[in-house]
Amino acid sequence: MTLVLTIRLLTSADIPDIARWVAETPLWQHYHVTENSFAKRLSDGLANGATIFVAEDNKNVLGFLWFVERGAFNRSAYVQLIGVRPDKRASGVGRELMQFAEARATSNDIFLLVSGFNTDAHRFYQRLGYSQIGKIDDFVIAGTSELIFRKQLKKE
């Protein structure tokens, strides 16, 4: 079945479902994310004017993207967080969200961090044209490295 995605801004009504499936995901569990902590993080983001999008199909939220226009070095676009519902991974949702972020970016490049152990994500971003340009040890939690990925964008 082909998904027909709509990307729109996150609303408070989206938060409970997203927080539930994020908390059930091993990657997020590695970072000690709970349903309550993630719901609070999204709610706080909304309250503080963060730019958070959701991808939905037939009114079902399948993924989210937290985008910061000048979030890297106060000049470049930054994907702060991205997540896809576990049963919709490898369905094109993540790719659509990343292409959406790239199209929104006004800078000539876009950055993101990826868990060092998340090799599936490394391959995903590399297929989209991102390159690993660095590594930060113990940045989010002790014992876990975050890899810095960057893509140069062709902006007119």
Task: Give short role names for the model-derived ranges.
Residues L5, L9-R89, M98-F100, R104, ...:
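Acetyl-CoA-dependent GNAT
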Residues M98, A105-G116:
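Conserved GNAT acetyl-CoA-binding A-motif
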Residues R95:
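Residues forming the Rossmann-fold NAD(P)(H) cofactor-binding site
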